[in-house]
Amino acid sequence: MRLYLFFISSLLLAESRRSISKISHDEINQHVKTTLSSEGIVRIGHLHPTNPIIAHEPDVLKMCADDLKMRNILPQNYTLTVFTMESCNKYSGVEHAAFLHYLKNASVYFGPGCNNEMLVIGRLAPRWNVPIIAHMSGDDALSDRVQFPTLGSVALTSASEMAKATVTYLNLNNWDQIGIVRPSVGYERLSVYSLQHQIKKRDINLNVILDIEPFSSPEEIISTGKLTTLKSMARIIVVELGMDIHSVTNFMLAIHRSEIKNEEFVFVIPWLAHQNDHYPWEAANVDKQEVKLAFENTIIITAHGYDKKFFDDFQMKFSAVTGVLANHYATLSYMSLYDALFLYGLALRDAFEDGGGYNVHMNGSLIWSRMTNRQFIGMTGQVLMNNKAIRVPSYATYHAINGTLKIVVELEAKNNDRGQCEKNEEMCSEHVAHETIQYYWPSDSGKLPPAVPKCGFTGAECDYRPYFIGASLLAFILTVGPLSYFIYLKQKERLLYDMTWRIPRESIKMLEGKSKSEHSLASKSQSSGSFSGSMNSKQNGLIAAKQAVSNGVKLAIKRYQQVRNITFPKSELRLLKELKICENDNLNKFYGISFNQQNEFIVMWVLCSRGSLEDILFNDELKLGRNFQVSFAKDVVKGLNFLHTSPLLHHGMLCLQNCLVDSNWTVKLTNFATEAVIFEKLDHNELRPFINTDSESADDVSDPTKDFARKKYLQQAPEIIREIVTTKTIPEGSQSADIYALGMVLYQILFRVEPFHERNKSINKLMETLAMANDDDQLIRPTFPSSNTGEGYNLQLLSCIEACWLEIPEMRPPIKKVRTMVNANLKSTGKGSLVDQMMKMMEEYTANLENMVRDRTALLEEAQKQADRLLNSMLPKSIAEDLKIGKPVLPQLYSCATVLFSDIRGFTRISSTSTPLQVVTFLNDMFSGFDAIIAKHDAYKVETIGDAYMIVSGVPTENGNSHAQNIADVALKMRAFICNFKLAHRPEELMMVRIGFHSGPVAAGVVGLAAPRYCLFGDTVNTASRMESTGVANKIQISEGAYNLLHCFFPQFQMVERGKIEVKGKGECLTYYLEGRTGKQ
């Protein structure tokens, strides 16, 4: 066949040259000179198939050329010119390729879309030193770089890569013996041809090859007797009968009608056709139900990985340009053609930037080399090119059942490093298998069958004597079996109703206080510097959860008021039984439930001492290293992986608050599979929220509309939020919803920010937006912080998290794939175990704590000084010191002290014409001046009442007779201060003050407990007050007792007699005016 094609290509090349020779040599030479002199003009040879379905390929090339120019991928002076000519019509493409080369000087070829012409032009292209890029052809021969050294392909699938993917799937299931069904002619172009070479290198035996004549009907296939041969030699059968879907349909109908198909047979169908919207059972003129049955339990391998959003966006853009809405097949073809030109543009840019100059597009081999070993995001998703410039697509295997295809294994494309490629060219690229579903096969175990049945292909390898013995026992079993089974069910039911998880109320002892060492995260009253951190209890994963002890085990509990007796249905009894026996290093232990006692319903989990991940991650004072984040993320994934493979099946309410940390810094998932049960009983009024005396709510489950509950539910999948918002109920949950929530948890662990922190919306608004979103434009998801781009998290990990947030639940990755991705992309940076890292961090923390203690001590000392200053301003210093040390302050009588009163003349008039703020400002300014004067003397300000000011000297510290001198000096300075004092709001106002003082015995003591005041009592205080009230403005009136002290002991003071005045309660008293003082002592 290949020799025939080579012969045809030689004849066509000769014919092309004869056609071209008809044109004058002068015309050719003149045209070539013109074209070669135009630097930067890239002439594109487009060989357009005659298929009318894809008639708009030239428009697609123009779209891509415009995009390359707009995105500055092409150098500035480059221009793309497209020449479109017919192909795939009696080898017209070969003639037109020659025409484009010799007369148009084409720099690159796109197409043709048919294999026969591609094989010919692909051999001519290296002779002309131009690259040729296929976007539809998938022939196995195209990967031969000896014959096609300048050929590249961006086709969504190819025979060679499909063969590699098929071998990967065979190896995944340990199938080492297979059969192949292929067409009797033309199979060289299919993946089965490449598959025959691939399996020889992978130790897979090919037991049988079945050739089927083209266009054979099911009856004709059965009549050949070949199916009997197939049955006797293979159970794993790879079926590929060309691009025509009807050939495969007829073969599968023959298998179905011959009744040789059962769960021992696996038919693997590599599907090269791209018409994914057209399944065999949707074709016309077929019995759709029979075709569905014929394809049931087949495995279909097809291209996978292009996002539907890319498809829809391209279709809209194409429609806007052409006004045509292309069908599915045409759109995929157009998208591949777009990617082909985009790949060429990238290669051309790289060659130019490497110094190729503006004529670099004439060097086809150099351009081709830049198309190898690279990847980019194209219209069909991620385009991964191997060392042969052939696209390595990702594939998926689908299980067909009842007309529905479900992905069971994803085969992810991957380029290996250059070292592996140099050792073995076949290892330059590979497919990595990710199982998405297990136990789906219709066998008793749900597992896929082995390559060879237990008794061989013909059944001759088994000894059937045990079956005869078994038959003799069958009667006995049929007699005794039902009775035994009935006893077994009764025993199982009894165990179910034993309720090993039920805890007697009398064995539970409530702990009123929360231990600082064990639950410091639950209260703000703890020191924020403790290693466990601190958070408001409303933000703790163990919110309401009081602590209790049962049989020596410390528990976190949630309490509810029980309205009436509770009876659990069997489904809930099974759930609680599984909860009780469920144990894993990354799951918190469910301790049990106490109910139908003391009108209380108590849910108990083992206490985790360090609180929740939310408390730890959002405590800014906790400087956790990357190793802790890596360990936390892996622990959460491991815990969820265990749940998804356990009888519990899912968590139901995964969030950061339900991820607890124990004393060993291991993350344990909690509250799994219980919240929906509790809410159901609250909703049926069997339970009520427990009212705590400390005003904490019982549980956010009781009301999913509360802010805290909404904060937790904000991390749930949109379908869960939708049900919470619309029905105010908590759904049971699912594995796909857990995966969405896992993405949220990983996001918060890695970046230590809350989801949607960048959106200035309330939690209510965010919940409503998530619940009501029904359009791609309305979907909102957290954004990765730009400040964390240097954290070292690669794009694969971030893409995995984004995949967890997909709107359609079925498209989210399974937990096994997420675990593989997390383990591969999250690596610890330090040496030693996490405990070693924790110990090192604690050492650093201890050093940091010393600095923190030093800083806090300094702040405390400063606060103490401020308190002392405030206390000393309220009480005499000696009295304040006694009160601070708890020494009782007893009332005391002083034989002689001097008391002064002052009062502002006209204060009432000034106050009535000023605002309250002006009055306060005025008094503050004046009394601040008085305070400054007192501070320079041995005197104490007792109190101020309005504009009245009271001072004493000689109390509480006695100072002989100096108290009279101190008060006299203060009085003179006060009068001088007032004479120069100006009101800020009435500067023209002349201020005047009355001052009076008296010397005599007084009693003093502290009065009051809440606001203690140091008060003076006695006749001396009354007399001093009368000296002020009967005085004259800007005069200092003193009593006879004060005069005698000053006159005898301090003659420097100048005093004049005023005379006798009437004093209330005293009668006539002789008083004096203090005028001033001289330097005489």
UniProtKB/Swiss-Prot annotation:
Membrane topology qualifier: Single-pass type I membrane protein
UniProt-annotated binding residues for ATP: 526-534, 558
Gene Ontology biological process terms in this record: calcium-mediated signaling; cellular response to acidic pH; cGMP biosynthetic process; detection of carbon dioxide; detection of chemical stimulus involved in sensory perception; positive regulation of exocytosis; positive regulation of neuronal action potential; receptor guanylyl cyclase signaling pathway
Tissue expression summary: Expressed in BAG sensory neurons.
Pfam families tied to this protein: ANF_receptor, Guanylate_cyc, HNOBA, PK_Tyr_Ser-Thr
Protein's name in the database: Receptor-type guanylate cyclase gcy-9
Binding-site residues for Mg(2+) 1, renumbered to this chain: 903, 947
Transmembrane segments: 467-487
Ranges for domain Protein kinase: 520-826
PANTHER family on file: GUANYLYL CYCLASE (PTHR11920), RECEPTOR-TYPE GUANYLATE CYCLASE GCY-9 (PTHR11920:SF503)
Cytoplasmic side, ranges: 488-1081
EC number(s) stated in the UniProt entry for this protein: 4.6.1.2
Family per similarity comment: Belongs to the adenylyl cyclase class-4/guanylyl cyclase family.
Organism of provenance: Caenorhabditis elegans
Known catalytic reactions: GTP = 3',5'-cyclic GMP + diphosphate
Keywords of the record: ATP-binding, Cell membrane, Cell projection, cGMP biosynthesis, Coiled coil, Glycoprotein, GTP-binding, Lyase, Magnesium, Membrane, Metal-binding, Nucleotide-binding, Receptor, Signal, Transmembrane, Transmembrane helix
GO MF: ATP binding; GTP binding; guanylate cyclase activity; metal ion binding; peptide receptor activity; protein kinase activity
One Gene Ontology cellular component annotation held by this UniProt entry: plasma membrane
Signal sequence coordinates: 1-21
Domain called Guanylate cyclase: residue spans: 898-1028
Source taxon at top rank: Eukaryota
Source taxonomy: Eukaryota, Metazoa, Ecdysozoa, Nematoda, Chromadorea
Principal location class: membrane
Glycosylation sites: 77, 105, 363, 402
